A protein has these predicted regions:
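N-terminal secretory signal peptides and thylakoid transit peptides that target proteins
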Residues: 1-18
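C-terminal segment of N-terminal export signals and the immediately downstream linker at the start
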Residues: 24-51, 58-59
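Conserved, mostly hydrophobic/aromatic
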Residues: 40, 60, 68, 85, ...
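Acidic-and-aromatic substrate-binding clefts and catalytic sites of carbohydrate-active enzymes
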Residues: 46-50, 69-80, 98-106, 131, ...
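Acidic/histidine-rich catalytic cores of soluble enzymes
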Residues: 166-259, 266
Length: 304
């Protein structure tokens, strides 16, 4: 999800499974470059799900996606979500929640996702150690205001959350944005997070697109932390004359048409511990399902 346009979502959203293959209509479907099912982060269809939850999931499956990652359940019950996922022929291995959501309703979130059969609970956006200091500030200001002390506090939070999620039979993880790669006093927050979090309690979902926008090197990260990263987000951005920044990312693009070079990233990822990957496109210049079909085909046909 984006560092800026997800504000509404962040404020309002309420044993790992490894799928080496998927079967649709008796046909074995594997996706390059990982021989893993093609996944979609459902934030991509956040405007469609509230209107027709079950129907949107069926459309997603018809595009060629086999797994989805939740970004809110839109007030549906466990039974309703499970029925919609099953009716679409999809798998739901992972769910996103902001730190604020997790802090407010952690036990309910654990219980809901455990009953649903989810394997990963992912923190989609970090917290601020002392939120009062930023009360009333814009989201843009908040994104720029994370200190090393905030990141170290988040590491402590993630370890505690990881213990509870692990005790419930699931895996806790963290999904990066852009600000984790802006050095502070010679320290890269992303590296500090991984240094201070317990590998048995906290896995990483590496958003390759946000790494690039934030000034990081996804290839180097995958090579440095091959055992810590179990999931990927795959996105692309349009070419633009304006320089990208932590708080001003370029517009989203369909995969294969923008600035991202996934060949070296996927080559490095093949040597890592990737269990799932999810396409995520957050803005569209064409009908969303048309764009997401192009994204799915890009992944299906990608060769490393």
């Amino acid at each position: 999800m984006p560092a800026l346009t997800r504000r509404e979502f962040l404020r309002s959203s309420s044993a790992a499974l490894v799928y080496g293959s998927a079967f649709v209509g008796g046909t074995r479907l594997l996706a390059s470059p990982f021989d893993l099912p093609i996944g979609l982060q459902l934030y991509s269809v956040r405007k469609l799900l509230p209107k027709d939850y079950a129907g949107t999931l069926k459309q997603v499956a018809a595009l060629g996606y086999q797994e989805v990652e939740a970004a809110g359940y839109f007030n549906h019950s466990v039974k309703e979500v499970r029925e919609a996922i099953d009716a679409a022929g999809l798998r739901l291995p992972s769910a996103h929640y902001s730190h604020d959501d997790l802090s407010r309703d952690f036990d309910k979130i654990i219980d809901f996702n455990k009953e649903l059969g989810v394997s990963y609970i992912i923190c989609s956006f970090p917290g601020i150690k002392n939120p009062a200091r930023l009360k009333g500030h814009s989201f843009k200001t908040i994104v720029q205001s994370f200190t090393i002390d905030d990141w170290r506090w988040n590491a402590e939070e993630f370890n505690k959350m990881g213990e509870k999620v692990k005790a419930a039979g699931m895996q806790f993880g963290y999904h990066n944005h852009t600000m984790e790669f802006r050095p502070q006093h010679g320290i890269v927050p992303f590296d500090e997070l991984l240094r201070l979090t317990d590998p048995s309690l906290v896995t990483i979902e590496l958003d390759c697109g946000w790494v690039m926008v934030g000034g990081g090197d996804a290839v180097a990260i995958l090579k440095r932390y091959p055992s810590r990263i179990s999931m990927l987000h795959v996105k692309d951005f349009k070419k633009t004359r304006k320089p990208a920044s932590v708080v001003a990312p370029p517009p989203a693009a369909v995969l294969g048409t923008g600035t991202a070079d996934y060949q070296p990233i996927f080559e490095a990822a093949r040597r890592a511990n990737i269990k799932h990957y999810f396409v995520e496109q957050e803005e569209f210049d064409r009908p969303p399902m048309e764009a997401l079909k192009i994204d799915a085909d890009y992944m299906k046909n990608f060769k490393t």
